[in-house]
Amino acid sequence: MLFIFQLTLLAFIGLSLALVIGVPVLLASPEGWAQSKGLVFSGSALWMLLVFVVGALNSFVS
């Protein structure tokens, strides 16, 4: 269970880093918000899902 928690936490940290770097770059592109809206929303939804999954797994690990 600890290994699954660590992998999920690593995915959460990696996605957070990708969103912090990627969203401003996507919004600064010439097409901007219109072209990359779906990618930003799906990344944000996955991030929120990982927040809850990491929280739930944390209760099993500690």
Swiss-Prot record:
The superkingdom listed in its UniProt entry is Eukaryota
Q: Where are the transmembrane segments?
A: 8-28, 41-61
What Pfam families is this protein classified in? Ycf9 (PF01737)
Cite the InterPro entries for this sequence. PSII_PsbZ, PSII_PsbZ_sf
Any one Gene Ontology BP term: photosystem II stabilization
Asked whether the keyword Aminoacyl-tRNA synthetase is assigned, the reply is no
* Membrane topology listed for this record: Multi-pass membrane protein
Record bears the keyword Hydrolase: no
> Where does the UniProt entry say this protein principally localizes?
plastid
Provide the protein's localization: Plastid, Chloroplast thylakoid membrane
The similarity annotation says: Belongs to the PsbZ family.
Q: Which HAMAP family match?
A: PSII_PsbZ
User: What PANTHER family does the record tag this protein with?
Assistant: PHOTOSYSTEM II REACTION CENTER PROTEIN Z
| Task of the protein | May control the interaction of photosystem II (PSII) cores with the light-harvesting antenna, regulates electron flow through the 2 photosystem reaction centers. PSII is a light-driven water plastoquinone oxidoreductase, using light energy to abstract electrons from H(2)O, generating a proton gradient subsequently used for ATP formation.
Tell me the protein's name: Photosystem II reaction center protein Z
